[in-house]
Amino acid sequence: MRRLRFSPRSSFARTLLLIVTLLFASLVTTYLVVLNFAILPSLQQFNKVLAYEVRMLMTDKLQLEDGTQLVVPPAFRREIYRELGISLYSNEAAEEAGLRWAQHYEFLSHQMAQQLGGPTEVRVEVNKSSPVVWLKTWLSPNIWVRVPLTEIHQGDFSPLFRYTLAIMLLAIGGAWLFIRIQNRPLVDLEHAALQVGKGIIPPPLREYGASEVRSVTRAFNHMAAGVKQLADDRTLLMAGVSHDLRTPLTRIRLATEMMSEQDGYLAESINKDIEECNAIIEQFIDYLRTGQEMPMEMADLNAVLGEVIAAESGYEREIETALYPGSIEVKMHPLSIKRAVANMVVNAARYGNGWIKVSSGTEPNRAWFQVEDDGPGIAPEQRKHLFQPFVRGDSARTISGTGLGLAIVQRIVDNHNGMLELGTSERGGLSIRAWLPVPVTRAQGTTKEG
């Protein structure tokens, strides 16, 4: 089933929309009930009384219920005119007295015609003081009867409208506040889940709200505690394995130093293997370390890139640069970003053919740095798996490595609320670009400079 294009996504918006819809439906239903069972019967009764008044004023005789004909004296009719404020006008005089501004109502004319027994036209004039009813009956087709409704004032409807609007706004405001309170535990749960996704275990959440939400929060706290225990056990295990492995490696290195000069080539080969083992162990430790919470600070991204370029460049490796002119202030953990850039450069050196390019730049609200190589590249269908631990591309299977370098980069960038993007370099190799968020003030300034 397709979701409506403009349907709200969040539970807060959906619940608020549901309450507002139900409130509106309740108001419409109340209006229809009052209209059909109170207003329309009262209006019919009003028309009936008004019809009797008009008939009494327009005829000399009235027929009573028992059939007796009653003669209405002219003086009595004039007294009724005066008491009720009724006036008689010719067609031209009625136009000048306000008939031109009166609105014709077909249903009132139809009901009045039924009461008077002949064609009747009813118009209603709404002025600043009170409404006025104009009638022209078949009894006197050239005379308009003006009946002011002095007991009904236009201002009487304003409080009713204000009270109805106030009740509706109070109901919507109360619903909004209630839903906000109900959704607050879910917002806390969302933030905590995002932290767990980054490898940061938050403190146990406070269990409050509805019983279902409390149950979910309790289950989440149990899950987070289990994840933390698992992460701690893993870190302890890797630390123990690292210590236990480096001890025999150190003894092997000491043994190679006591080998004779004739076995120098063998000692050099053994030392290379020892260095590779140490590098693998260090990568495991780095991978575990990146899951921990890191203190952030404002730092210049270009300065961090420059330190890595200076450290990784040498007589065996030339790194081409295309850095953004000026500084790029980013909220980051400089040591972690330095580790990520170094891993990207080492990856480019290991799988490329000697050419490496490091560049940086800015866009509105974010900055980026990029490392390119001229190696065989990675097929597009394999790129989405490249950041998973221990996963390596087909072209890298013949080269030694753990498959953790880019996984470490991914973790570091995720901890900075950034994202990674793989592409093809200008020389056909692999291009890795990391995006980092930039404070709004800095992003606006960067846009002007660029």
UniProtKB/Swiss-Prot annotation:
Outcome recorded upon mutating residue 247 to R: In envZ11/MH1461; OmpF- OmpC constitutive. Also prevents expression of PhoA and LamB. Phosphorylates OmpR but does not dephosphorylate it
Residues annotated with Phosphohistidine modification: 243
Record motif polyP-cytoplasmic motif, residues: 201-205
Key words of the record: ATP-binding, Cell inner membrane, Cell membrane, Kinase, Membrane, Nucleotide-binding, Phosphoprotein, Stress response, Transferase, Transmembrane, Transmembrane helix, Two-component regulatory system
Motif polyP-periplasmic motif location, chain numbering: 71-75
TM regions (residue ranges): 16-35, 159-179
Keyword Kinase carried by entry: yes
Membrane topology, Periplasmic segments: 36-158
Regulation: Activity is modulated by MzrA. In the presence of 0.2 M NaCl, 2.0 mM sodium cholate (bile salts) decreases expression from the ompC promoter; how this is mediated is unknown. Autophosphorylation is inhibited by the angucycline antibiotic waldiomycin in a non-competitive manner; waldiomycin prevents dimerization of the cytoplasmic domain and autophosphorylation.
Segments forming domain HAMP: 180-232
Domain Histidine kinase: 240-440
Outcome of substituting residue 243 to R: Does not autophosphorylate, does not dephosphorylate OmpR in vitro, no OmpC or OmpF at 0% sucrose, low levels of OmpC and very low levels of OmpF at 15% sucrose
Binding site for ATP: 243, 347-351, 373, 392-393, 402-406
GO molecular function: ATP binding; identical protein binding; phosphoprotein phosphatase activity; phosphorelay sensor kinase activity; protein homodimerization activity
BP-aspect Gene Ontology terms: phosphorelay signal transduction system; protein autophosphorylation; response to osmotic stress; signal transduction
Membrane-related topology note: Multi-pass membrane protein
Note: Cross talk between this and the Che and Ntr two-component systems can occur at least in vitro.
Function, as annotated: Member of the two-component regulatory system EnvZ/OmpR involved in osmoregulation (particularly of genes ompF and ompC) as well as other genes. EnvZ functions as a membrane-associated protein kinase that phosphorylates OmpR in response to environmental signals; at low osmolarity OmpR activates ompF transcription, while at high osmolarity it represses ompF and activates ompC transcription. Also dephosphorylates OmpR in the presence of ATP.
Name under which the protein is recorded: Sensor histidine kinase EnvZ
Organism: Escherichia coli (strain K12)
Gene: envZ
